Amino acid sequence: MLTYNIHWVGVPAGRALMRFYTPAQDVFRIEVEIESTGAAGFFYPLLDRIAITGARDGQKLQTLHYEKLQVKEKGRFTEQVFDRDKGVVIRALNHGKPEVLKQVGPEVNEPITALYVARAREAFSAGEEIEIPVVNGQQNYVGRMVVHPREELETPLGRFAVIPVSVHLKKSELFKQERAIQVWFTDDERRLPVRVETDVRIGFMAADLIAFDDGRGHKRDSR
């Protein structure tokens, strides 16, 4: 479980929770909840819940089902089913008529799982560009993750050796993507994303990791 404090244009704006677990040896599940609070909650009310289920083979992950509930947007519900046998993604909005998207390859996932796969690489080299095949809404494309030189980063949980990366994705429902998403992963086998910076619909958002439980007996909480 990862817990984040979110700042919007420099002021406290909300919280985010992310959980990755394996209910069975060959199955993974990711759960995300993002909620805006305070002034940000007034100007940009947000309560999104995302659930992803997929197949797991070691570090290889394949999304099979994705759903997103946008509570503050009149309960807008998005569902995607990845039919891996046919190589297509079936998408439905608000339980309406399903729409078959373009053909997708076996390595294509939605953005969250795609980033989990990219960060699980055994080694990162400064200057390296990693391709990220994604389907995002109606878009099917190859994003990029650019690796930057290692550095030290002070966080609410203390100081970490980190690997900064820039993630280049196309515009989506949440991200404006006028610039790349910046992520700082811990430089260890956990690759914890301790800080994330991105553009959103109205302004700039930063998320700092304030608590984690990696499921291996390591946990820390700054609260």
Where would I find each of the regions flagged by the language model?
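Acidic, serine/threonine-rich low-complexity disordered tracts
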Residues: 1-84, 121-223
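Hydrophobic, well-structured mid-protein blocks that either form specific transmembrane helices
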Residues: 77-121
